[in-house]
A protein has these predicted regions:
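Leucine-rich repeat
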Residues: 214, 242, 274, 305, ...
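Short, solvent-exposed loop/turn at the beta-strand->alpha-helix junction
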Residues: 174-181, 201-207, 226-233, 254-262, ...
C-alpha cells in the first residue's frame, strides 16, 4: 500500500502551486517568509525553478539577510555574508538535477575543482541556471526558425513542452496570468541573467536585439554567418553589447573584409580608436580574401589591440603566410597576449623568417623578445609541423619566458623534432620553465620519447602535465616512465602507446614509492591483468590521485577484484576510475562490491553495465 503524504508535504505542494500561479493579492507570500526555518527549508527543497525564482525575487529586503549560511568553521560565531545561502544551494541542486552532464568527471573539471570550491562564494547559481535555460530556449527556437516554412516573428516561437515543464510550469488557463510558452516571454523574464550566449545565424536580426536587451553579455558566440544579411544583424547585436562583451567567437563562418571593417568600426569605443575585446576566436571558419596569402589590414589592427589577451584562430584556413603575418603583427604591436592558438591550420614554415632575423640581428632579437614576454599558452596542434619547424620554434620559445603550456599534438615532428626541443628544456630549467607539454600523436618512437624523459628526469624539470598518447612507444618505454614518475608530474596521458602486459609489469617495478599524480590515462594499452595490478600499486602510492582512465585494456574478470581490494586500503582522494571498454568486466556481476565502495565514500567506477557480446577491443590501425 502506498504511503500517504504527510500534512507538511501537502501544504508544501499547495504553496508551490500558489507561488507558481497565484497573484498574491492576499499577501500569502509574506506569511511564507515568516515560516520556521525547518518548514521554510522543506518548502525550498520542493520548489521548481520558476517558483523558486518568484519566491526569491519577491522577498522583502529586510528578510533577505536571514537566508545566508551560518559560519560553521569554529573560528567565529557570526553569520557568513556570502552568496551561497539557502537559495543558492537550492539553485545549485536544481542546476545539476536538470543538467547532470555538467557535473561529469573530466580532466579539465577536476583540475579546477579545488579552485572552484575555494571561490564558490563568487558563483551565482541562480544566474547560471537561467543563463543555461535561456540558451536551451534559443537552441530549441533555432530548430523551428531554420525550417523553410517558418515566416513568423522569432519571439513568438513556441518552445517545446519539455522546456516549460523543466522550470515547473504547467498550462493552467484559468489561474495563470502569464504565458511561458514563447521565446519572447522567457527572454523578458530571464534574459537579465544571461552573460554568455551562443546564437545561430537565424537570430542575426534586429528582433534579437529586442530579445536580449536586458542581458549584459560578456561572451558572445556567433555561428554560421555567411551572407550580408547576417553581417548586418551581427553588427547590430555587437553595437548593442559592445561595452560589455569581452569574449567574441565566430564559428563556422565566412568572414569577408567588409565584415571585418564593419565589426571593427562597430566595436570601437566612443572617443578612442580601440575596442575592449579581451578574447577573440575564429573557429572552423574561412576568411574571404582576394589574396589567400593575406589578411585584412583592419583585422591585423584589431588583433594588435593592447586589450587583447587571447587570440584563437583554429581551423581558420590561414596558411603559413598568414600565420607569419599574424605573428609579425603581434610582435610589432607589442601585444600583451597570454594565449595564442593557431591550431589545425597547416602552417609549416611559419617561423622561418623569425629565425633568420634572430640569427642575423642581435639587437633586433632583443627588441623582439620584449613582445613575447606575456605569452603563457601556445597551441600549435595539428599544423603539419616538422623537424625544421621545431628548430625554428626553439628560437622563438627562448624568448617566451613565462610560457606555461605548449601543445604540439597531431604534428609529425618525429624523434628529431623532439630532440630539437631538448636544449630549450636545459636552458629554461632554472627560470620560468614550461609546465604543460602535449606531444600526443607526434609519430614518436621509443628513442625520441626516452631521450626526452631521461633529460626531464636528469634536470628534475618541474613539469606538471605531459601527454605522449597515440605514439607507438612499445613496452620498452616503461622503465623511463617509471623513473619519470619520481618527478613533479601531476597529469600523465599515456593512452595507446603500446605498453602491453610486459610494459605494465615493468612500469610497476620501476614506479617510486611516492607518486605525485593527480590524473593518469593508461587506456588502450592491452595491459590485461598486469594493468589492474599496476593500478593496485598506483592507488596505494598516489595519495593525491583523483582520476584514472584505464578503459579498453583487455582486463579479465578478476581485475575488478584486484582494483577493489586496493580501494579498501586507500588513504587518498580518488574520485573516478574509468574501466569502460574492458568488455569482460561486468558491473551487474559485481553490483554489491561497487555499491559497497560507493557507500564507503569511494570513487565512482565506470564499468560495463552488462556482459559484452564478444565485442573484443581491436586496436589494429
Amino acid at each position: 500500500m502506498e504511503k500517504a503524504p504527510s500534512l507538511v508535504n501537502l501544504c508544501a505542494v499547495s504553496l508551490r502551486n500558489y507561488i507558481l500561479y497565484g497573484d498574491d493579492d492576499n499577501g500569502i507570500l509574506q506569511g511564507v517568509y515568516e515560516l520556521p526555518t525547518e518548514l521554510f527549508d522543506c518548502l525550498l527543497n520542493q520548489l521548481p525553478a520558476l517558483a523558486l525564482h518568484k519566491l526569491q525575487s519577491q522577498m522583502p529586503i529586510e528578510k533577505q539577510s536571514e537566508f545566508y549560511e551560518y559560519d560553521c568553521s569554529g573560528t567565529g560565531g557570526g553569520r557568513k555574508r556570502v552568496r551561497c545561502g539557502k537559495f543558492d544551494l537550492a539553485w545549485k541542486a536544481l542546476y545539476y538535477l536538470r543538467w547532470p552532464e555538467n557535473d561529469e568527471y573530466s580532466q579539465e573539471k577536476l583540475l579546477v575543482k579545488k579552485i572552484e570550491l575555494e571561490n564558490e562564494t563568487l558563483c551565482d547559481w541562480q544566474q547560471k541556471y537561467w543563463e543555461m535555460h535561456v540558451q536551451n530556449c534559443f537552441d530549441a527556437a533555432a530548430e523551428t526558425a531554420m525550417l523553410p516554412s517558418f515566416s513568423q516573428r522569432i519571439g513568438l516561437i513556441e518552445l517545446p513542452g519539455a522546456l516549460i515543464k523543466a522550470i515547473g510550469y504547467e498550462q493552467r488557463a484559468k489561474c495563470s496570468n502569464r504565458d511561458y510558452y514563447t521565446l519572447d516571454t522567457h527572454c523578458k523574464e530571464f534574459g537579465y541573467y544571461v552573460r554568455c550566449l551562443r546564437l545561430q545565424n537565424v537570430f542575426f536580426s534586429v528582433e534579437t536585439c529586442h530579445l536580449i536587451a536586458r542581458s549584459k553579455l560578456k561572451t558572445l558566440i556567433l555561428k554560421r554567418m555567411s551572407s550580408q544579411l547576417h553581417v548586418d544583424g551581427v553588427c547590430k547585436i555587437l553595437c548593442q553589447h559592445k561595452e560589455n562583451i569581452e569574449f567574441l567567437e565566430f564559428a563556422n563562418c565566412k568572414i569577408s573584409s567588409s565584415f571585418v571593417e564593419a565589426m571593427c568600426q562597430t566595436l570601437t569605443v566612443k572617443g578612442t580608436e580601440m575596442h575592449v575585446i579581451k578574447h577573440f576566436a575564429v573557429k572552423s571558419s574561412k576568411f574571404l580574401e582576394a589574396n589567400p596569402a593575406s589578411l585584412s589590414p583592419m583585422l591585423l589592427t584589431f588583433i594588435s589591440s593592447r586589450f587583447l589577451e587571447t587570440l584563437e584562430l583554429s581551423d581558420a584556413h590561414i596558411g603559413r603566410n598568414c600565420a607569419k603575418l599574424i605573428f609579425s603583427t603581434l610582435i610589432d604591436a607589442s601585444s600583451a597576449l597570454s594565449t595564442l592558438d593557431l591550431s589545425d591550420n597547416n602552417i609549416s614554415g611559419w617561423l622561418s623568417d623569425f629565425r633568420c632575423e634572430v640569427s642575423n640581428k642581435d639587437s633586433a632579437f632583443r627588441d623582439i623578445s620584449k613582445c613575447l614576454q606575456s605569452l603563457r599558452v601556445l597551441n600549435l596542434r595539428g599544423n603539419n609541423l616538422r623537424k625544421s619547424d621545431m628548430d625554428d620554434l626553439r628560437f622563438a620559445l627562448a624568448h617566451m619566458p613565462v610560457l606555461e603550456e605548449l601543445d604540439l599534438a597531431d604534428n609529425p615532428i618525429e624523434d628529431d623534432g623532439v630532440k630539437s626541443l631538448i636544449p630549450y628544456f636545459v636552458e629554461t630549467v632554472e627560470h620560468g620553465p614550461l609546465s604543460n607539454l602535449n606531444l600526443k600523436n607526434c609519430e614518436l618512437s621509443f628513442d625520441g620519447a626516452t631521450g626526452l624523459l631521461d633529460v626531464l628526469v636528469a634536470l628534475k624539470y618541474p613539469m606538471t602535465f605531459l601527454s605522449l598518447a597515440d605514439n607507438d612507444l612499445g613496452s620498452r618505454i616503461a622503465p623511463a616512465l617509471g623513473d619519470f614518475l619520481c618527478t613533479s608530474i601531476r597529469f600523465l596521458d599515456i593512452r595507446d602507446i603500446g605498453l602491453g602486459s610486459t610494459g605494465f609489469l615493468e612500469l610497476k617495478i620501476h614506479m617510486p614509492n611516492v607518486v605525485n599524480l593527480t590524473y593518469i590515462n593508461i587506456s588502450e594499452n592491452r595491459g590485461g591483468i598486469q594493468a589492474a595490478e599496476f593500478l593496485e600499486d598506483l592507488i596505494s602510492r598516489a595519495q593525491e590521485l583523483l582520476v584514472v582512465r584505464a578503459g579498453y585494456n583487455l582486463m579479465p574478470p578478476e581485475s575488478l577484484n584486484v582494483i577493489c581490494s586496493a580501494l579498501d586500503n586507500r588513504k587518498g582522494k580518488l574520485q573516478l576510475i574509468d574501466l569502460m571498454g574492458n568488455h569482460k568486466l561486468c558491473g551487474s556481476k559485481h553490483a554489491s562490491i561497487l555499491a559497497e565502495i560507493q557507500r564507503n565514500g569511494g570513487p565512482t567506477m565506470l564499468v560495463q553495465s552488462s556482459p559484452s557480446q564478444e565485442a573484443a577491443y581491436d586496436d589494429d590501425p
